[in-house]
Amino acid sequence: HRKNAGQSRAIRSGILAARAPVIGTLDGDGQNDPADLPDHYRQLTRADAPESLKMVMGRRTKRKDTAWKRFGSTFANNIRKRMLKDDCDDAGCGVKALYRDSFLQLPYFDHIHRYVPALMRADGFDVEYRDVNHRERRTGTSNYTNFGRLADALSDLRGVMWLIRRRRNPGGMDEL
């Protein structure tokens, strides 16, 4: 991108440019450990994985963030988890392995990266969660604050709830 277009746009652009059927994502600040991706890939593509499993997502343990940031994240995750019923404890974790075609079926909007598990489930897909490492930030500064994220999060949450209520899962398609 010629200018910063946000995390969700960066993820979508990368996935659009990719050609592999399975995509791995990480945040760009160095806090996610790339060593976690092979495990996610193996879980997603294992022989006994249900056909409906389309994403394996990280759940950060031993977070290397301030107590205030951890509090804000836990508070927000509990609200969104309760409202969206997606069982996602850590929507902000960037470590994901997912099927490209399943992700591209989702409606795009800014900040979608926090709602991918809920939207995947609304489309009838399964999502699994795995514990991942979390490291000190190695580059850049956070563009988020607890209060700054709150207004966007409340608006986005209402929008995602609206989208989910209106999505019709056909339960698959058969060729005629």
Question: Model-derived features: where do they sit?
Answer:
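Acceptor/aglycone-binding surface of glycosyltransferases and processive sugar-polymer synthases
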Residues: R2-A17, V22-T25, P34-R114, R135-W162, ...
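Juxtamembrane C-terminal module of membrane proteins
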Residues: R167-L176
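Catalytic donor-sugar/metal-binding loop of nucleotide-sugar-dependent glycosyltransferases
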Residues: Y108, I112, A118-R135
